């Protein structure tokens, strides 16, 4: 039976742990939240922190607001790879950074304490709790997200240029303006909002013992989102391979083109069109390797053999493209 570590924690308790080291892995999809989702989050948090628009009705000892699960597993580098919760965790980081940018310059005692707590959520700290602002608690390696560096730069510096238009930048600006409006409207409440978010908003971290277990949990919990497919995992292996060769951008474009092609060809009952392509290529490889067993192993199990060696060469990727072209035109030319 798979072992799970599940322990409900406040935002502050989870983010400020000394060992907290989150990674948005390369097989995840790019950040997708926009102003609509950020507005909903802001409104929900405000209504929770100030019930009936009254600061004094909040009970800091008992009031809690559940933000949802964070499904992770510890990879070989000791980082917690985020399988589920990427969008809300990223957005919470942007929100806290926006609070820090505003409160960090204030000299009021409560603002100073609040800023200290936020520092411990965003950056790694020394034994005295002082932050190393070059060492974030979260990193992103999302393969197809060209704007991820903007996210990391926002967390490190809190600044933006006018030319930065990513979802990260737009949402950060959104929160900055909401905080300005909040301080202008409720100046006496300024110290309570971020503290109540950090101390009383609850996340449910679920740490699985392996990637496969984490993905299964995600698929079970997430009935609204789009679970990661086998092809997403395979894409990460190709991405690492081509990045090491200095051909990352070329690969990303070819992969996007292949996705478009497969979407127009395959319409599987289960799985994604890209999963269907990998399934058909698996049968080709099984025949080429002389595998005669009538029992077909699971798709991911087949490709992950020998540390995904089949996905770490140029020919496999070219064969996949050729196979998709064949399905479109009827001419599959695979090289051995």
Segments the model singles out, each with a brief description of its role:
Residues 33-45, 63, 87-88, 164-172, ...:
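Phosphate/oxyanion-binding active-site loops and adjacent basic polyanion-contact surfaces
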Residues 56-57, 63, 103-137:
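Flexible phosphate/Mg2+-sensing switch loops adjacent to catalytic phosphate-binding sites
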Residues 1-83, 93, 191, 200-204:
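Short alpha-helix boundary/capping and kink motifs at helix termini
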Residues 4-22, 125-154:
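Short, compositionally biased low-complexity segments
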Residues 88-105:
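Short active-site loop/helix that positions an aromatic residue
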Residues 137-336:
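Polyanionic (Asp/Glu-rich) segments that form extended negatively charged tracts
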Residues 48, 99-102, 224:
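Phosphate/oxyanion-binding loops and surfaces in catalytic or ligand/nucleic-acid-binding neighborhoods
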